[in-house]
């Protein structure tokens, strides 16, 4: 028998408890529903899409959020984005986006979210790109995905 005494059994039990507790402590990594990136690395670009059925899906940023919007079609209800400068959530459809700046926050070529045109333009002055509305961003991304 491979475990001859109580000490061997106890050691195996302790090791198993440590392994199981470590795995449960580490938890499961939450990933972007579109690209699979670790969401804990992108709190500054958090983007959440809500469906007409009430389901919420978090993406790493606006680009994956726009992708999900296009995939959901009529099941898309709303989205919230995070303003890169203020770090506040806002209604994504009322926001402004800088497309193709020199900064890549989550995905390339990149749409970076801003709650106000002023924040988007302030960012654009330093890092380039094009300031667009949500609808314009959606149309640009629809063309890029063809």
Where are these regions (language model features)?
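Bacterial N-terminal signal peptides that target proteins for export
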Residues: 2-14
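Bacterial N-terminal signal peptides
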Residues: 12-22
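Short acidic/polar alpha-helix capping motifs at helix-coil junctions
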Residues: 13, 28-33, 83-87
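N-terminal secretory signal peptides
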Residues: 26-73
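Short glycine-enriched loop/turn motifs at secondary-structure junctions
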Residues: 50-54, 103-108, 124-125
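A residue-level structural signature of the nucleotidyltransferase/glycosyltransferase Rossmann-like core
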Residues: 56-57, 111-112, 129
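Mid-chain, structured segments of secreted extracytoplasmic proteins
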Residues: 60-109
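C-terminal partner/receptor-binding element of secreted or periplasmic proteins
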Residues: 115-146
């Amino acid at each position: 028998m491979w475990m001859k005494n109580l000490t061997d059994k106890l050691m195996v039990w302790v090791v198993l408890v440590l392994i199981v507790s470590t795995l449960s402590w580490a938890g499961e990594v939450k990933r972007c529903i579109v690209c699979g990136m670790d969401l804990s690395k992108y709190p500054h670009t958090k983007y959440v899409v809500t469906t007409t059925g009430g389901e919420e899906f978090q993406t790493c940023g606006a680009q994956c959020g726009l992708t999900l919007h296009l995939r959901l079609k009529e099941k898309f209800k709303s989205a919230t984005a995070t303003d890169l400068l203020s770090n506040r959530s806002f209604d994504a459809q009322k926001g402004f986006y800088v497309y193709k700046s020199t900064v890549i926050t989550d995905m390339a070529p990149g749409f970076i979210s801003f709650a106000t045109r002023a924040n988007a333009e302030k960012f654009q002055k330093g890092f380039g790109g094009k300031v667009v509305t949500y609808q314009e961003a959606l149309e640009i991304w629809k063309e890029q995905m063809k």
